Amino acid sequence: MTLEHQFDYDAIIIGSGPGGEGAAMGLAKHGAKIAVIERHYNVGGGCTHWGTIPSKALRHAVSRIIEFNQNPLYSDNSRIIRSSFSDILRHADSVIGQQTRMRQGFYERNQCELFSGEASFIDAHTIAVHYPDNTHETLTAANIIIATGSRPYHPAEVDFNHPRIYDSDSILQLDHEPQHVIIYGAGVIGCEYASIFRGLSVKVDLINTRDRLLAFLDQEMSDALSYHFWNNGVVIRHNEEFDSIEGLSDGVIVNLKSGKKMKADCLLYANGRTGNTETLGLENIGLSTDSRGQLKVNSMYQTALAHIYAIGDVIGYPSLASAAYDQGRLAAQAIIKGDASAHLIEDIPTGIYTIPEISSVGKTEQELTAMKVPYEVGRAQFKHLARAQIVGMNVGSLKILFHRETKQILGIHCFGERAAEIIHIGQAIMEQKGEGNTIEYFVNTTFNYPTMAEAYRVAALNGLNRLF
């Protein structure tokens, strides 16, 4: 790729999260001259520092504590491992450090120039980089990619400066040991932190603004999570919204519109996210966002200005780190070739890192029923698998939805430990074209034994035996 001489760079990428990294690597591999602007002092974006990586590291530490305390091999009922939130945060910090160093190396090896400052548009090809010491410099580029991510949504009536009111970013600076937590918002983030806190024996009240947990999931998966939370002592309030939130010296009171009142040591507000666009100076180039700070793009991730692209959380759905990386790669392809021949896959897998995990890909039973598709269900319970019995992972199941006539796999849903890994075995077959996508593959192939992957053979046999 040859540099257009009137510009400093072929492309400027604003943000170094998964989307920015995918774009930078895609462009650099084709010889483009790249500048990456990151306002945080380290690369990685929200995914590495406040979102995916720390929350999953916390979850892993908690799940291992639970496993130890429940395993009769280690536990004799006289000793129980207990750990505080601040203790397990140290594990998360270690992982964040490893991730940051690795990603810093990616940029350095690919000769991407990094600028640590706040970016804003001066005009459609010029970016000002504002540094913490109040100095600034300007950079120009033929193409600009906005990959600034998102942050927790802050309603004006909630005082997030109060020391007992947290969002999903600031919760990582929790400096006391709560005995009781209220989590407002039962989306993915809210449910994951409900699992983490309950796993640390903290009392958890989960306020859900909808009528069931994670309504986008297959209903059986949603119901399984609800039951598991209930069985572990999480109190869930469905169809509730806050009227007011009062911060106290030693806690917080949440007044609900239904008239209920709830009190706890602290509140985690986890209801919605907002695109990081307010400081970009978009008004200087004629771009505007929706009410949640998100930009509209076409199939090649171009905004209303063809040389300015947007990817990742800043464009909304699907708001997944995995998808953001692919979007960055596709935007790079569009810049290099003038067109993005590839697109995100239709069925993007979802991984939810509650305890136990949930993962799904493809259609739910509710969607197939509404579409009047003649499908059948194959199920495997983890408790019937030798590997699950050996490692003590008896809670969980795998469900395969397939067409009764063609045997084509239509959806896969998994609840249980390692679900986010297990799902990809089925996804690989489901993504095959034509006759390659068939549930009979799992009957006709040979699995290692004992493995969790064997659940696919059990579920396939279960489903095929239902046909007549």
Curated annotation (Swiss-Prot):
GO biological process: 2-oxoglutarate metabolic process; NADP metabolic process
Cofactors: FAD
Residues reported in the UniProt entry to bind FAD: E38, R39, H40, Y41, N42, V43, G44, G45, G46, C47
GO cellular component: cytosol
GO molecular function terms noted in the UniProt entry: dihydrolipoyl dehydrogenase (NADH) activity; flavin adenine dinucleotide binding; NAD(P)+ transhydrogenase (Si-specific) activity
Keywords associated with the record: Cytoplasm, FAD, Flavoprotein, NAD, NADP, Oxidoreductase
Purpose of the protein: Conversion of NADPH, generated by peripheral catabolic pathways, to NADH, which can enter the respiratory chain for energy generation.
Family that this chain belongs to: Belongs to the class-I pyridine nucleotide-disulfide oxidoreductase family.
Designated name of the protein: Soluble pyridine nucleotide transhydrogenase
Annotated organism of origin: Pectobacterium atrosepticum (strain SCRI 1043 / ATCC BAA-672) (Erwinia carotovora subsp. atroseptica)
